[in-house]
Amino acid sequence: MKFSIITANKNGGRFLEETIRSVISQKESGVDLEYIVIDGGSIDESLNIINSYEKDISKIVSESDQGPVSAINKGLKLASGEIVAWLNADDRYHSGALKRVAQVMAAYPGKALCFGACRIIDEEGREIRKGITSFKEFFFSYSSQFTIQCINYISQPAMFFRRSAIEKAGHLREDLEAAWDYDLTLRLWRQGGGVYVPGVPLSDFRWHTSSISAKRYATQFKEEFDVAVKDAGWPTPQILIHWLVRWGIVGTYTLMAVTRMMRGAR
C-alpha cells in the first residue's frame, strides 16, 4: 500500500525540518512512501532545509502560489499513492503512524478515510490543551455522517484518505479561508465513510501565534458551520447541535485569548 504525503510550506523553516524528519522516518517501518513538498517561494531557510533532504523527498516544487490550499491542491494532483494525506510544515507524525494507518485501511477496504488521535503541542513541542483533545476523542466511537456534521472532531494531521475517494469528492476549495479541511472531510465521508485508527496518537498539531487556527478561529468556525449546513441541509438536528457547539468553542477560545492578553499585560 503506497502512501503519498504532501507538505506545503512558505517561510516555515522554524519547524520544517522536524516535519520532514517525521515523514521520512515512516520508511523505517517498511512503508512505501511518496513524499511531495510544495514550497511557495520561501525566502527564509526553508529551501536549504528541503534541499538537504532531497534524496528522501520524491517530488519538490518551488514556485509562487496562492496560499496553502493552492499548494496542497498542487500536491494532490501529483500524488500517485493509494492513500493520501498532507502534513503542514509545523506539524509532525509519530513513529509508526503510517504503518498503523495501512493496517486499518487494508482491513476496511470500503472506507474512504481513516483518522486517529492527534495531540496539540506548543512551539516547544509540549502537549497543551488536553481538554480539547479529550473532547474530540469522545466522538471517535460514535463516528458517522451525523456526528461529523455536528462537530469537526477529526484533526487534519491525523486524517488519511484514499486517492480514489478524493478523485470523486474533488480537491480542496480555494475560496475558503480556514475550513477547507473540514469541507473536504464531509465530502470524503460521502464516498464511503471513515474508520478510527485506535491506539496512541498518530500525529501532533502545533498551535502557535502564526498558525491559521490561532489567527482565524472565529472565521474557521463560521465557515465550518456554513459547510455543515451545505452538507446536512437546514433545518436539521445536527446543524442545531453544530451551532450550539460552535458558539461554545468560540466562547472558550475567546476567553483563552483574553486571559493570555491579560497575563501579558502584567
Q: What is each model feature region?
A:
Residues 2-4, 34, 183:
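Cell-envelope/extracellular polymer assembly enzymes that use nucleotide-activated donors
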Residues 84:
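Short aromatic/hydrophobic "clamp" motif used to bind/position activated sugar donors
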Residues 6, 137-223:
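Conserved nucleotide-sugar donor-binding catalytic segment
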Residues 12-25:
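Short, well-formed alpha-helical segments that are part of the catalytic scaffolds
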